[in-house]
C-alpha cells in the first residue's frame, strides 16, 4: 500500500494525519469560542480606565534611569523623539487592587499589561490574578484608545504611562506583557523610543513581529495596515537597534489563526536579546489565558538575563 496516501499516513497516535489535523483544529476552535464567550462577559469591566491607587508611604524614592539616546531615523521620515524630561499630566494606569505596595520581596518589578487590537484591560483579568497569587505586588494594566490609528503614537502614550508608573512605585524599571498588538506597541517603545532604559523584560503573546496576512478585509484600518509584513512600521522595526537593553520573550503558537504564517509571532532581530517560546494547540485569544502560557510568563518575569541585571545595577 502506498504510504504517501494521506488516508494511510498516521501520526504518533495512530490517527490519519488529515483526521488528526481536523480534530486539533476543532479543539482549538472550541477553546477560542469558550475564551471569547468568557471575555465578552468580562469586557464591560475593562472599558473604563481605573485611577491609580495612592502610592504607599514605604515606596522608596524613584531611582534615576540611565540617560536615553535618540533612536535612529525611520525609513519614512525623521526619528520619533524619545520621551525625556517632565511628563505632562500623566494618564492614570489601572491597578489591580490592592497592588499599591512596594516591589515584591523576591525583587519582582512592577508589571504593566498591554491588551490587543479592539480590546481592553479585561483580557488580562486571569493573568493579573495569577501574578498576584504568585507574589507580584505591582500589577497594572492600561487601556489605549480603540480609535488608535498609529502604533508609534500608542507607543509614545505608553511611555507616559511608564514614567507615571515608575514615579508612583519608586522603581526605575518595569516589566511589560503585551498581547497581540499590545506586544508590538511595547516593542516599538522599547526598541525605537528609548524605552529600554525603563523596560527590563517585554513578554509578547501572539504578537505579529514579522507582520501577518490574516483578516485581509480589515486593511482599511491604518493599524491593521501597519501590521502587514511589508509595512513601513515593520521596515522600521527591522532597522539596527544597537545597545537595546530590554530582554524580549516572544510566545507563539502553531495553532494561531491570526498569525499568518504562525511563525510571524516569533521575534528575530540581530541586535535584540530574544527568547522565542513555541506552544502547541493554543489559539490567538487563548494565549492570554492558557495555563501553560501563564506559567511561562511567570517564569519569564522571574528569569533575568545577565545584561538586564547589569543595567539594573548601573
Please give the residue ranges for each predicted region.
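Flexible, membrane-associating and regulatory peripheral segments of lipid-active enzymes
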Residues: 1-111, 125, 134, 309-314
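Glycine-rich beta-alpha junction loops
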Residues: 254-257, 279-281
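Short alpha-helix in the alpha/beta-hydrolase fold that links the catalytic acid
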Residues: 127, 260-267
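Post-His helix in hydrolase/transferase enzymes
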Residues: 288-302
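Serine-dependent carboxylesterase/thioesterase catalytic core
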Residues: 111-122, 128-245, 251, 258, ...
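Catalytic histidine neighborhood in serine/cysteine hydrolases
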Residues: 137-138, 270-287, 297
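Short, proline-enriched alpha-helix->beta-strand connector loops that line the catalytic pocket
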Residues: 107-109, 242-248, 271-275
Amino acid at each position: 500500500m502506498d504510504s504517501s496516501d494521506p488516508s494511510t499516513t498516521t501520526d504518533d497516535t495512530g490517527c490519519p494525519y488529515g483526521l488528526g489535523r481536523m480534530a486539533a483544529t476543532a479543539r482549538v476552535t472550541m477553546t477560542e469560542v469558550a475564551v471569547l464567550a468568557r471575555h465578552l462577559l468580562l469586557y464591560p469591566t475593562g472599558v473604563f480606565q481605573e485611577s491609580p491607587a495612592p502610592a504607599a508611604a514605604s515606596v522608596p524614592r524613584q531611582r534615576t534611569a540611565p540617560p536615553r539616546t535618540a533612536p535612529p531615523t525611520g525609513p519614512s521620515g525623521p526619528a520619533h523623539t524619545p520621551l525625556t524630561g517632565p511628563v505632562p499630566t500623566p494618564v492614570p494606569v489601572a491597578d489591580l487592587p490592592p497592588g499599591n505596595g512596594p516591589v515584591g520581596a523576591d525583587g519582582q518589578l512592577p508589571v504593566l499589561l498591554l491588551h490587543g487590537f479592539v480590546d481592553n484591560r479585561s483580557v488580562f483579568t486571569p493573568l493579573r490574578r495569577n501574578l498576584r497569587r504568585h507574589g507580584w505586588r505591582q500589577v497594572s494594566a492600561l487601556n489605549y484608545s480603540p480609535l488608535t490609528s498609529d502604533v508609534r503614537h500608542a507607543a509614545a502614550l505608553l511611555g507616559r504611562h511608564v514614567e507615571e508608573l515608575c514615579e508612583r512605585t519608586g522603581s526605575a524599571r518595569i516589566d511589560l506583557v503585551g498581547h497581540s498588538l499590545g506586544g508590538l506597541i511595547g516593542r516599538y517603545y522599547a526598541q525605537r523610543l528609548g524605552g529600554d532604559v525603563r523596560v527590563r523584560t517585554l513578554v509578547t503573546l501572539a504578537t505579529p513581529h514579522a507582520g501577518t496576512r490574516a483578516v485581509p478585509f480589515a486593511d482599511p484600518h491604518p493599524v491593521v495596515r501597519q501590521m502587514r509584513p511589508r509595512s513601513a512600521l515593520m521596515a522600521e522595526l527591522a532597522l539596527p537597534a544597537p545597545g537595546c537593553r530590554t530582554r524580549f520573550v516572544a510566545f507563539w503558537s502553531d495553532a494561531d489563526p491570526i498569525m499568518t504564517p504562525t511563525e510571524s509571532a516569533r521575534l528575530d532581530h540581530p541586535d535584540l536579546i530574544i527568547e522565542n517560546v513555541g506552544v502547541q494547540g493554543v489559539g490567538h485569544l487563548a494565549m492570554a489565558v492558557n495555563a501553560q502560557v501563564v506559567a511561562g510568563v511567570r517564569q519569564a518575569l522571574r528569569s533575568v538575563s545577565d545584561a538586564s541585571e547589569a543595567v539594573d545595577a548601573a
